[in-house]
Amino acid sequence: LGCGTGTMTEKLADYGYDMIGVDNSEDMLELAMEKRMESGKDILYLLQDMREFELYGTVRAIVSVCDSVNYITEPEELEEVFRLVNNYLDPKGVFLFDFNTVYKYKEVMGDTVIAEDRGECSFIWDNFYYEEEQINEYDLTLFIQEDGSEDLYRRYQETHYQRGYTLEEMKELVERSGLVFEAAYDAVTHEEPTEKSERIYIVAREFGK
């Protein structure tokens, strides 16, 4: 879910899994399908909003990484995403996802500016954190080098909104959706999350619909 340009989808396909990628960005899926053509993998991509996604049947596992769920800024809508996940999982199927925490947006990223020069691509990342709503707005300005030119860069601008969640909030949403909450891990230490965990992995499971 939220497969983006298909990088993780391709990696999982490398391990022999049959993959379906779901994303609501045509541009992202276009890049994903270019990667599919290069690799020759049999991956099905679907242009769908994860809040309303539909599959042709149930699957053994659903994965959502790279803070895709943080783009769902209303808890009620995220609960509905989890209900759909539960609906499309095989009996006792597993759901793996990650999310950025309130701590990360408030204490690490909030109201900061990040700038980086990577040669062919440079960016300025300007963050604004709204504490009451737990929402982080970031304005991203990209400078991407044009093919065949050393001096010409094209500028692109994007604005994104992501909501931070606490582990307690996320656990409640998972359980209210009908899924069974199994485990949580700090994304860096792979141990039990702490108050200062910035990204958390969640393992949940279908257990009867």
Name every feature range the model reports, one short phrase each.
Residues G2-G4:
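Class I SAM-dependent methyltransferase "Motif I" SAM/SAH-binding loop
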Residues T7-E52:
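Class I SAM-dependent methyltransferase SAM/SAH-binding core
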Residues E54-A61:
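A short acidic, Gly/Pro-enriched loop at the edge of an enzyme's catalytic core
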Residues E79-P91:
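A short glycine-rich, Lys/Arg-flanked "PGG" loop and its adjoining helix->strand segment in the class I
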Residues L96-K171:
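SAM-dependent methyltransferase
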Residues Y161-K209:
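C-terminal lobe and adjacent flexible extensions of AdoMet/dcAdoMet transferase-like proteins
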